[in-house]
Amino acid sequence: MKLEVLPLDQKTFSAYGDVIETQEREFFHINNGLVERYHDLAKVEVLEQDRTLISINRAQPAAMPIVVHELERHPLGTQAFVPMNGEAFVVIVALGDDKPDLSTLRAFISNGRQGVNYHRNVWHHPLFAWQTVTDFLTVDRGGSDNCDVESIPTHELCFA
């Protein structure tokens, strides 16, 4: 099956998470007016006994064509990825309770100046780079195991 890749924007991505970007976002000045602060762009969630982690993930480019055969989710916390050097990247997401609802399966490509924050329990493809090795600033939870993985029928990404 083919899965069309759409441009990433907050309106079409909102059911799955937050788009982390400055475009069309409110800001205020700090540090004597030298800094524009784009405040509270994503909601980070962890359970009370867990803690928030900041990491860097170095992702390798996926082999082309990109074939999707599994999704994962994190029921105990959100997970954010922000490319550190302006690289575009692809995210693949779906809603669903115990298993991914394939009628909600979507793929998005960022513009290189956007990151994503997946809501808790949102099914998504494991992180990968698109065209080049990419470092991602990653914000997620530390604690016990927090990853459910489900196989799905194979889908091939189709770039419009």
Swiss-Prot record:
Pathway(s) the chain acts in: Nitrogen metabolism; (S)-allantoin degradation
What domain of life is recorded for the organism? Bacteria
Q: What class of enzyme is it?
A: lyase
Known InterPro entries for this protein? RmlC_Cupin_sf, UAH_cupin, Ureidogly_lyase, Ureidogly_lyase_bac, Ureidoglycolate_lyase_dom_sf
Q: Which SUPFAM superfamilies match?
A: RmlC-like cupins (SSF51182)
Query: What EC identifiers does the entry list?
Result: 4.3.2.3
One GO biological-process annotation of the entry reads:
allantoin catabolic process
Q: Which reaction does it catalyse?
A: (S)-ureidoglycolate = urea + glyoxylate
Which cofactor(s) does the record list?
Ni(2+)
- Recall the GO molecular function terms of this protein's record: ureidoglycolate hydrolase activity; ureidoglycolate lyase activity
Q: Give a yes or no for keyword Lyase in this entry.
A: yes
Gene3D superfamilies assigned to the protein according to its UniProt record, in alphabetical order? Ureidoglycolate hydrolase
Spell out the CDD domains in the cross-references: cupin_UAH (cd20298)
**A Pfam family:** Ureidogly_lyase
Q: Which UniProt keywords apply?
A: Lyase, Purine metabolism
Question: What family does the Swiss-Prot or TrEMBL record give for this protein?
Answer: Belongs to the ureidoglycolate lyase family.
Q: Subunit details for this protein?
A: Homodimer.
What's the protein here called? Ureidoglycolate lyase
- The record lists the organism as Salmonella typhimurium (strain LT2 / SGSC1412 / ATCC 700720)
Q: Which gene encodes it?
A: allA
